[in-house]
Amino acid sequence: MKVYLVGGAVRDRLLGIPVQEQDWVVVGATPEELLKRKYRQVGRDFPVFLHPETKEEYALARTERKSAPGYYGFICDFSESVTLEEDLARRDLTINAMAMDEQGNLIDPYQGQRDLEEKLLRHVSPAFAEDPVRVLRVARFASRFHHLGFKIANETRLLMYSMVKQGELAHLIPERVWQEWQKSLQEKNPEQFILSLRSCDALRVVLPEINSLFGVPNPHQYHQEIDTGIHSLMALRASSELSEEPLVRFAALVHDLGKASTPIQDWPKHHGHEEEGTKLIRALCARLRIPNDYRDLAVTVARAHLNIHRVCELRPNTIVKLLEQVDAFRRPQLFHKILIACQADAESCGKTVVYRQTQLWNEILSECVKVTPQTFIVQGYEGKAIKEAMHQSRVACVERIMTSWKSNEK
């Protein structure tokens, strides 16, 4: 029985970046042997075990053979005779197909170290095409390592394109699409996930709602970048500079989703795209089973972003109603996320923007939350009268703030 460190831990060690988790491959052993050594089996489809002390994952070396279309269409062999090289051969990219023995010696049968040095994301073998999830994984690694200068190898991009044309991506299950997309939203360059999928025509299949934004014009006076798809990616890029939260980044990306569904004869104007966008976001989230907190924030940003931008043009009563509608008084942290997504939208319009709306909205909210029910209860207000009195008191707060704000602007 021999044990090897494999995959991402080896890759990240060679890159000199922090190792998040360690995975191990066991060669020349059986499940029974590991169980005798107090390892705990957790793998359902193939034997994966947790170390009795470190709780790190140890998997028996295995091979995979395609037996049917899709993610689950594989026959696995995890017998004692499977070699380390055979196990590494089934992996997606050469940079993920390296191992280290217990003495720290590198085992690199597929030139992963060379591709690390050349900053290339290259598939290990033609077997890459047997698993459609690998297209998504390559796009995710592109988003993770873009800041280090990594590119997808031309031959790998061509293979991904071929997989799309052959219809292999039709077998992707919704959970895996979202799993890879969500992971990419946590990377340094989440926009590269979308760009990588688009470069091999996979975006059209996997995320048609986003793909349809490319080629949709925007009014030039607001968007120097013109194209709605490009603007959406710029908003995603801007949001990743402002926040590490994937919820905010997702909301920034899909805030203009409705623009592709507005009447073509009205372009580049997009009247009503806010409400149209909320429908598309709900449908997208239902299709990919995206969590409700992502959906709810994205829907709110899509619906409210124009009014958030135009705060100085709104009546005080409208401002208070908006804050009530987005539940800002009870959930100010949620409103903060909305503001970040809106700021990302404003900063992605192809010109230098100082988004003072954030300061103004925060000032308004901080004053309005000081209005509490107790003030009116002691005055004898009851039921709906309390709510109405609070609303009017908040409107008065906004009037004072807006008057002061506008006088300072002169």
UniProtKB/Swiss-Prot annotation:
Manner of cofactor binding, per the entry note: Magnesium is required for nucleotidyltransferase activity. Nickel for phosphatase activity.
Annotated positions binding Mg(2+): E21, D23
Residues given in the record as CTP binding sites: G8, R11, R91, R137, R140
Alphabetized Gene3D superfamilies for the sequence: Beta Polymerase, domain 2, cca-adding enzyme, domain 2
Keywords linked to the UniProt accession: ATP-binding, Hydrolase, Magnesium, Metal-binding, Multifunctional enzyme, Nickel, Nucleotide-binding, Nucleotidyltransferase, RNA repair, RNA-binding, Transferase, tRNA processing
Catalyzed reactions per annotation: a tRNA precursor + 2 CTP + ATP = a tRNA with a 3' CCA end + 3 diphosphate; a tRNA with a 3' CCA end + 2 CTP + ATP = a tRNA with a 3' CCACCA end + 3 diphosphate
One Gene Ontology molecular-function label: ATP binding
Record-annotated membrane-spanning stretches: none
Boundaries of every HD domain copy: 228-329
Written domain comment of the UniProt record: Comprises two domains: an N-terminal domain containing the nucleotidyltransferase activity and a C-terminal HD domain associated with both phosphodiesterase and phosphatase activities.
Sequence similarity: Belongs to the tRNA nucleotidyltransferase/poly(A) polymerase family. Bacterial CCA-adding enzyme type 1 subfamily.
Protein name as annotated: Multifunctional CCA protein
Gene (UniProt): cca
